């Protein structure tokens, strides 16, 4: 990407084996949405994955085997409903200014993630 937003979601979106590079915001879940990513790469974005929703029509809380590299903020959780634990098992966070900015204090599990 060349700035802007790579994926601007307003519904449930399931991403598998996708690459997001060079965006202002790679993927964002807007109101009513949930963006799930598995085996995806987020690199050189200002924000990799962003949640800014107060309700969601469907959830998918497993964020396994993703790579977040050299982003300003890898994952930004401004607002996210529910109490499903976001699981980053197998995901790698490397060279980001901020790995996870969880303003919403949503439950997350990084026990099986790697931080470099």
Where are these regions (language model features)?
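Extracellular beta-rich repeat passengers
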Residues: 1-116
């Amino acid at each position: 990407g060349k700035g802007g937003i790579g994926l601007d979601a307003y519904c449930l979106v399931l991403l598998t084996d996708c690459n997001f590079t060079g965006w202002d915001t790679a993927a964002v879940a807007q109101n009513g949405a949930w963006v799930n990513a598995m085996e995806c790469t987020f690199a050189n974005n200002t924000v990799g994955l962003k949640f800014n929703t107060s309700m969601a029509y469907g959830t998918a809380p497993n964020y396994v085997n993703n790579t977040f590299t050299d982003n300003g903020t890898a994952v930004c959780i401004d607002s996210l409903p529910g109490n499903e634990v976001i699981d980053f098992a197998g995901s790698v966070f490397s060279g980001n200014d901020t790995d996870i900015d969880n303003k919403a204090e949503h439950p997350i599990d990084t026990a099986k993630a790697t931080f470099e």
